Amino acid sequence: MPNTKHLLALLTITSIAACSAPESSEESSGSAAVFNTTLTVQEVMALVLEPASDTLWGSGGWVLDASGYEELYPTTEEGWAFVRAQAAVVVEAGNMLALPGRAVDNDAWMIYSEGLSEAGLNAMAAAQSQNKEDFFQAGAKLYSVCTACHQAYNPDINNRFDIEAGDESADD
């Protein structure tokens, strides 16, 4: 009888082991994630991130000049939906910049990439709730992240806002 008990126990253990999920690892699956990083960091910035960021910055805040006071915030559901979609582009641009093949390092670059995504998420939430102050603050955070990253990784970059301000003062 002990043999029958041992055989039954062995059969039970084997059955349980056969039903359990196989261990998953990169080595056992043989396939690592593959990312298409054909676009350079500069192309991602110019073609993806900058247009979306410009939309957010151009849609938050106000202007007070000789013509008077003008709020820049969206005034329709469609307008808020559009800036929310552009904020989602900013979120994903942060992820795109963190991909292997684009990330410059695993240190500050990753912190800035994450900060970019966080600013985009903040802008998305503010657009969803149509909260003007939160939307403005999300734009400010986005500007801070962009400026800090450029100072750290490309200090020679021309800040187009400084250039535009210089052009305006030259007109005076």
Give the positions of each predicted feature:
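Bacterial N-terminal signal peptides that target proteins for export
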Residues: M1-L8
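Short glycine/proline-enriched turn or capping motifs at secondary-structure junctions
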Residues: H6, Q151-N158
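Hydrophobic helical h-region of N-terminal Sec-dependent signal peptides
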Residues: A9-I13
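C-terminal motif of bacterial Sec signal peptides marking the signal peptidase cleavage site
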Residues: S15-A18
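Hydrophobic membrane-targeting segments
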Residues: S20-P22
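Extracytoplasmic c-type cytochrome modules immediately beyond a signal peptide or single-pass transmembrane anchor
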Residues: S24-Y143, N158-D172
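The canonical Cys-X-X-Cys-His
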Residues: L142-Y153
